[in-house]
A protein has these predicted regions:
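N-terminal secretory signal peptides that target proteins for export/translocation
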Residues: 1-10
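Beta->alpha turn/N-cap motifs
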Residues: 98-103, 163, 193, 210-215, ...
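Hinge/capping helix and adjacent helix->loop/strand transition within the periplasmic-binding protein
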Residues: 88-93, 108-195, 244, 257-290
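An extracytoplasmic/periplasmic, membrane-proximal ligand-sensing/linker region
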Residues: 35-37, 180-183, 268-329
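N-terminal (or domain-start) structured segment
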Residues: 28-119, 158, 182-211, 218, ...
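Short beta-strand->loop
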Residues: 114-126, 162, 184-188, 206-207, ...
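Bacterial N-terminal signal peptides
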Residues: 12-25
Length: 329
């Protein structure tokens, strides 16, 4: 009995020693962080909204940290290539992921993702919220969302909309519109957002959901009619335009968001440091103005709040995509 007891005590001591060593190593890494340049991996090309935010935040992070912050574009597979790279990176705070709400659609669209957005990442902070605009071709006899819904109900399956593919923001916005209004409209997929908006201007489709910056010149030139914005509150660039929620579908909200993630198991001290800096950077008037000109609203939160946002987004988007039956593989 005493021999077994001694062995148990020895094993307990080993476990405690290992835990202490890991904690001390983690604390030492965090205390000296950063000792080399950081990388922010972006799953979209240079010039995209995600790339813009990564570069604006990265430049200012470099100033605070005293180390270069390199933005690395790893495009392809709707951003999942970049996400996979960061998911498998060392959890030391030197490789971060610039993520968008589009990532939340991928688990429902792809059956063999090599990572989990919840399990394999440590949220740092939200950076910005964006909205889309519901626009219709001038020939569509609808002046507001209520009239568009009435048209869709009167002619089930006749109205169509342009999207940039399964899981895209227009696709999800239309799915939510159909679900909440109990109507049926037809998706016409295009290769990208530009093509889907061009189709709405040309009258190839009845309506679409472009970004604010894409919609503004079209609205001002009379090429489309703007009915509403898809976010929960009115947009600063279009304060006169109501939300879909105000226009007959209370609770409607299909915003997009941008934020930073680190690999799971990144030391909490590093996550806390990065969160504090991102919050400080994004909430300056300079950044608010920069984001606003891009149709974005600067917004930050805690790592815990960001984790909750991601969890809720995954649940809502998965439900929406399943309702459409969409799949990319």
């Amino acid at each position: 009995m005493s021999k077994i007891w001694r062995r148990m005590e020895w094993l307990r001591a080993v476990v405690v020693a290992v835990i202490c060593a890991q904690w001390m190593a983690s604390a030492a890494i965090a205390q000296n962080y950063p000792l080399k340049p950081l990388r922010i991996v972006v799953g979209f090309p240079a010039g995209s909204g995600a790339d813009f935010i990564a570069r604006m935040v990265g430049q200012r992070l470099a100033g605070f940290l005293g180390q270069q912050v390199i933005v690395e574009n790893r495009t392809g597979a709707a951003g999942t290539i970049a996400t996979g790279v960061v998911a498998s990176a060392a959890p030391d705070g030197y490789m971060l992921l610039q993520v968008t709400a589009a990532e939340a659609a991928q688990p429902a669209l792809r059956s063999r993702l090599p990572y989990s957005l919840e399990r394999d990442f440590a949220p740092i902070s939200l950076e910005a919220i964006g909205t889309f605009v519901l626009v219709v071709h001038p020939s569509v006899p609808a002046r507001d969302v209520r009239q568009l819904i009435a048209l869709a109900r009167a002619q089930p399956g006749k109205l169509n909309y342009g999207s940039s593919g399964a899981g895209s923001s227009p696709h999800l916005a239309a799915a939510l519109l159909q679900q909440m209004a109990n109507v049926k409209v037809v998706e016409v997929p295009y290769k990208g957002a530009t093509e889907s908006v061009t189709a709405a201007v040309a009258g190839e489709v009845d309506f679409s959901f472009p970004s604010i910056t894409a919609a503004l010149p079209l609205m001002e030139s009379g090429k489309v009619k703007v009915l509403a914005v898809t976010s929960s509150k009115r947009a600063a660039l279009l304060p006169q335009v109501p939300t879909v929620s105000e226009s007959g579908l209370p609770g409607f909200d299909r915003s997009t968001w941008h934020g930073l993630l680190a690999p799971a198991s990144t030391p909490k001290e590093i996550v806390t440091t990065l969160n504090a800096l991102v919050v400080k950077i994004v909430n300056t008037q300079e950044m608010r103005d920069l984001f606003n000109r891009q149709g974005l609203e600067a917004q930050t939160n805690t790592p815990e709040q960001y984790a909750t946002l991601i969890k809720n987004e995954l649940a809502q988007v998965t439900k929406l995509i399943r309702s459409t039956g969409a799949k990319t593989e």
